[in-house]
Each structure stands twice: as structure tokens, then as C-alpha cells.
A protein has these predicted regions:
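Alpha/beta-hydrolase superfamily serine-hydrolase fold, recognizing
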Residues: 1-131
Length: 131
């Protein structure tokens, strides 16, 4: 999971801390959420906010977050919740990069290489275990 949105209530501290971050702002998050959910939808519904759902029995997860991202704490909280539910979850928070860094490998080459290596290693490991 790369910078996952797991809480449509937008109650994570990083939503405020990085409200004016490059690429993804709090304002754009509110716009996206409101268009997606429409009026009257429960923002804690696990179908849109998996952080509030049952997590036991889910497959192992790699959660990658960006330090300068309003969604950073969503990912951190989700990884912690998965672990608390007995799910194998690994978390990496990439420092000094914004949301979207994985799509911009030239913006922070060393971070991009590390992200891609970690992701490929985890996928390879999961496929080896499954097959």
C-alpha cells in the first residue's frame, strides 16, 4: 500500500500538519472525498475507511508512507492496526518526500530506488510464498 487513505474522517494529525503540502493538500482531499462519498455517507464505513473495519485475517501488507503527505498518519495508523489484529505488516515512512513521490523517481532518486527495491522485494517474497 503506497500512501494509503484509510480514514475518510480525515482525523489523522498529518492531515493538518501537511495541509498545504506539495502535490496533495487537505483542501483537495476534502474535495475528492466529498465527490466520492456524496452527502450523508458514513465516513467511518469500513468500505471507505478500512481503518475502522475488521482487519484480522487480512493478508500481509507493506505500507509505504511519505513524510510530507497529509495521508502519512493514515498509513502509519493502518499498519499499526493491522499488526494489532495479528496481521503481518511492515511500515516504511520515507522522509522529506511528498505524496506522489513514487510516481516521480527523478525528484528524489535515492528514495525512489529504495521504494522500488522494497516494493519489488516484498512482491517477490509474497509470490514465492504463494507458489
Amino acid at each position: 500500500l503506497i500512501y494509503p487513505a484509510t480514514d475518510a474522517t480525515m482525523s489523522s494529525p498529518s492531515v493538518q500538519q501537511n495541509a498545504h503540502a506539495p502535490i496533495l493538500t487537505r483542501r483537495s482531499m476534502v474535495t475528492f472525498r466529498d465527490h466520492y462519498l456524496g452527502p450523508g455517507h458514513d465516513r467511518r464505513d469500513p468500505l471507505v475507511s478500512p481503518l475502522f473495519g475488521r482487519l484480522d485475517g487480512l493478508p500481509p501488507a507493506l505500507v509505504q508512507t511519505a513524510d510530507l503527505d497529509p495521508l502519512r498518519d493514515d498509513g502509519i495508523r493502518y499498519a499499526e492496526a493491522l499488526q494489532a489484529a495479528g496481521v503481518s505488516a511492515r511500515l516504511t515512512n520515507y522522509l522529506k518526500v511528498p505524496h506522489g513521490f513514487a510516481s516521480m523517481p527523478g525528484a528524489a532518486p535515492a528514495v525512489g530506488r529504495q521504494h522500488r527495491w522494497e516494493l519489488a522485494t516484498e512482491v517477490r517474497s509474497a509470490l514465492s510464498a504463494a507458489g
